[in-house]
């Protein structure tokens, strides 16, 4: 075997691997000798099949195995010797594949992009600010009022009172396209809160001012993107009968409300609300801190990036954004989506930070434990109520899905490691200031 380097330019590497016909033949013979004692062919006793017969029956298959093993072994050796870590799976091609015949030399070309050397990074040089928001009494009261509103009841208004925004009207309705009723357009004694936007745009507005006992004809146009194709973009008339007009009555903020939400009493509910608010504030604060840290890393640590990784990431970004802009197109049967310069710039940032965090985690021997993975999978499974076990088994047998779950866990652990060694100061702010800081993240 002869291995010759043909390219060493930046991060690009190229090699030629030559396997002589003689060494391939010798390895085939060696493998056939190994299996000969176990081979049994009609007309020959077990272990007594002649080598010529073995070659005739199994030679091509064994030769294929020898070629694969030899090339894989050569690549492993050259990577061990060079210290290279390929950014993607090395590309292997048989140079004389179409014309190659057993017994002659087999020549393979191997090409890949190596991961770049990552500069050392000292987390102690990082200065960060953590925003702190306390769940004060006003915030807890506001949250309790929202809970009370969500638990509100409705009481009949005085007979003859006109319905207004926020009221609940109890209606029968039937929808028509022209003079023909359409399937799924009928309901009886349906409680509809005006202003909730739970019906087709314009429907609820036309019931404002209605009184109990009245018949109201509502005319609407279904949105062009409406889910039912036979209704999308069509004008329709709904004949409605109003049974009742009811006024909202917020629940009292008391022990009874607390029990509705699983708390022993009002004081216990206040404690739960305060804890939930503080958890939300901490989550938002961490997102801001993490963005600041990643900005620092992106600005301070520079190194060459494998073009193949940047190209793949830019393509993924462009594809994802295209689908976000075209939500009704769920398949991949669309034309090519070309990445823009903005996509490429974002891809460079993601690749740089991904490689940097991965290298730091590798050097510090940071790992995601089995227990952490199990918790993450269980959390993801809750998105599929009633099918948690099936989801768990699916993940268990799918390495790609496991990596999708493990990757963000790993990143967060590396971020935690950096923050733990950085100079972090705390700044107390209001929840409004925290909200503005969160909104600013989306603008960047």
Swiss-Prot record:
Q: Which SUPFAM superfamilies match?
A: FKBP-like (SSF54534), Triger factor/SurA peptide-binding domain-like (SSF109998), Trigger factor ribosome-binding domain (SSF102735)
Q: Which residues form the PPIase FKBP-type domain?
A: 166-251
The record's EC number reads: 5.2.1.8
Q: Which UniProt keywords apply?
A: Cell cycle, Cell division, Chaperone, Cytoplasm, Isomerase, Rotamase
In terms of Pfam families, this protein maps to: FKBP_C, Trigger_C, Trigger_N
Q: Which GO terms describe its molecular function?
A: peptidyl-prolyl cis-trans isomerase activity; protein folding chaperone; ribosome binding
EC main group: isomerase
Could you state one GO biological process linked to this protein? Answer: chaperone-mediated protein folding
Question: Which reactions fall under this protein's catalytic activity?
Answer: [protein]-peptidylproline (omega=180) = [protein]-peptidylproline (omega=0)
GO CC field: cytoplasm
Q: What does this protein do?
A: Involved in protein export. Acts as a chaperone by maintaining the newly synthesized protein in an open conformation. Functions as a peptidyl-prolyl cis-trans isomerase.
Give the family from UniProt. Belongs to the FKBP-type PPIase family. Tig subfamily.
Note what the entry says on domains: Consists of 3 domains; the N-terminus binds the ribosome, the middle domain has PPIase activity, while the C-terminus has intrinsic chaperone activity on its own.
- This chain belongs to the protein called Trigger factor
* Species of the source: Rhodobacter capsulatus (strain ATCC BAA-309 / NBRC 16581 / SB1003)
């Amino acid at each position: 075997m002869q291995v010759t380097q043909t390219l060493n330019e930046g991060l690009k590497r190229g090699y030629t691997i030559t396997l002589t016909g003689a060494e391939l033949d010798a390895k085939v013979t060696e493998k056939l000798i190994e299996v000969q004692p176990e081979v049994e062919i009609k007309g020959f006793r077990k272990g007594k099949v002649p080598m010529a017969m073995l070659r005739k029956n199994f030679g091509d298959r064994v030769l294929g195995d020898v070629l694969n093993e030899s090339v894989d072994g050569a690549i492993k050796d050259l990577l061990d010797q060079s210290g290279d870590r390929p950014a993607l799976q090395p590309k292997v091609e048989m140079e004389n594949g179409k014309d190659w015949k057993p017994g002659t030399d087999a020549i393979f070309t191997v090409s890949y992009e190596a991961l770049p050397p990552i500069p050392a990074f000292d987390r102690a040089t990082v200065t960060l600010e953590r925003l702190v928001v306390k769940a004060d009494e006003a915030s807890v009261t506001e949250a309790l009022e929202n809970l009370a509103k969500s638990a509100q009841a409705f009481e009949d208004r005085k007979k003859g009172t006109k319905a207004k925004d926020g009221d609940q009207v109890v209606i029968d309705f039937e929808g028509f396209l022209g003079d023909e009723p359409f399937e799924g357009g009928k309901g009886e004694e349906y409680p509809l809160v005006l202003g909730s936007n739970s019906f087709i745009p314009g429907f609820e507005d036309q019931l404002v001012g209605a009184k109990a006992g009245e018949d109201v004809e509502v005319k609407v146009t279904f949105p062009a993107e409406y889910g039912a194709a036979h209704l999308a973009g069509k004008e329709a008339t709904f004949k409605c009968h109003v049974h009742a007009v009811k006024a909202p009555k917020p629940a009292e903020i008391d022990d009874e409300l607390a029990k509705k939400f699983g708390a022993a009493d009002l004081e216990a509910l206040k404690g739960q609300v305060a804890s939930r608010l503080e958890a939300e504030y901490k989550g938002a604060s961490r997102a801001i801190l993490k963005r600041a840290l990643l900005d620092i890393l992106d600005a301070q640590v520079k190194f060459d990036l494998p073009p193949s990784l940047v190209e793949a990431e830019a393509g993924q970004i462009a594809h994802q954004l295209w689908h976000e802009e075209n939500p009704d197109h769920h398949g991949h049967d669309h034309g090519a989506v070309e990445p823009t310069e903005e996509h490429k710039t974002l891809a460079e940032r993601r690749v740089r930070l991904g490689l940097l965090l991965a290298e730091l985690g590798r050097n510090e021997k940071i790992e995601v434990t089995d227990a952490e993975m199990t918790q993450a999978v269980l959390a993801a499974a809750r998105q599929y109520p009633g099918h948690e076990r099936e989801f768990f088994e699916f993940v268990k047998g799918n390495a790609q899905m496991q990596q999708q779950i493990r990757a963000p866990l790993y990143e967060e652990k590396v971020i935690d490691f950096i923050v733990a060694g950085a100079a972090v100061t705390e700044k107390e702010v209001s929840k409004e200031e925290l909200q503005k800081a969160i909104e600013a993240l989306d603008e960047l």
